[in-house]
């Protein structure tokens, strides 16, 4: 018989840097999950990724306090900031442009996020990421 699901927890955890301090500890502690076990498993699973890369993680907690987790691809906004070489997006994206990306950089981001995007083809996915870039005040070239 399948385990009974007690709840879900969604967190953005830096790759290789999961530790019991907030926000991870309190979120897992509320559900009674072994915090150190999660931290060790997560850090082992993300050991091959760039340290500090934010990884959206969905943790499924079962009634016996065991857990499983699914890691998604990093947020598009983070990847765009990294590609454009900026610290943060523009406060007024329509008037103040803060960086620039081209189609090749957008295609690299789409390949990174491929599993999480629902676009029908590469061109549609590139346009989706380009829209995110424009809303952050990043100039998009070649799209």
UniProtKB/Swiss-Prot annotation:
GO molecular function annotation: large ribosomal subunit rRNA binding; structural constituent of ribosome
GO BP of this protein: translation
InterPro entries registered for this protein in UniProt: Ribosomal_uL11, Ribosomal_uL11_bac-typ, Ribosomal_uL11_C, Ribosomal_uL11_C_sf, Ribosomal_uL11_CS, Ribosomal_uL11_N, Ribosomal_uL11_N_sf
Gene Ontology CC: cytosolic large ribosomal subunit
Gene3D superfamilies per the UniProt record, alphabetical: Ribosomal protein L11, C-terminal domain, Ribosomal protein L11/L12, N-terminal domain
Keywords attached to this entry: Methylation, Ribonucleoprotein, Ribosomal protein, RNA-binding, rRNA-binding
Pfam families: Ribosomal_L11, Ribosomal_L11_N
Post-translational events: One or more lysine residues are methylated.
Record flagged with keyword Membrane: no
Function of the molecule: Forms part of the ribosomal stalk which helps the ribosome interact with GTP-bound translation factors.
Family statement drawn from the similarity comment of this UniProt entry: Belongs to the universal ribosomal protein uL11 family.
Subunit structure: Part of the ribosomal stalk of the 50S ribosomal subunit. Interacts with L10 and the large rRNA to form the base of the stalk. L10 forms an elongated spine to which L12 dimers bind in a sequential fashion forming a multimeric L10(L12)X complex.
Protein name: Large ribosomal subunit protein uL11
Organism: Psychrobacter cryohalolentis (strain ATCC BAA-1226 / DSM 17306 / VKM B-2378 / K5)
């Amino acid at each position: 018989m399948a385990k009974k699901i007690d709840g879900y927890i969604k967190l953005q955890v830096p790759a290789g840097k999961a530790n019991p301090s907030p926000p991870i500890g309190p979120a897992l502690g509320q559900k009674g999950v072994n915090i150190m076990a999660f931290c060790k498993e997560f850090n082992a699973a993300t050991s091959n990724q760039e340290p500090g890369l934010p990884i959206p993680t969905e943790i499924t907690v079962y009634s016996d306090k065991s857990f499983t987790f699914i890691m998604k691809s990093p947020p598009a906004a983070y990847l765009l900031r990294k590609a454009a070489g900026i610290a943060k997006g523009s406060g007024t994206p329509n008037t103040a442009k803060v960086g620039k990306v081209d189609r090749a950089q957008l295609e690299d981001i789409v390949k990174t996020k491929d599993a999480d995007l629902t676009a029908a083809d590469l061109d549609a996915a590139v346009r989706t990421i380009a829209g995110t870039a424009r809303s952050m005040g990043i100039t998009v070239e070649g799209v």
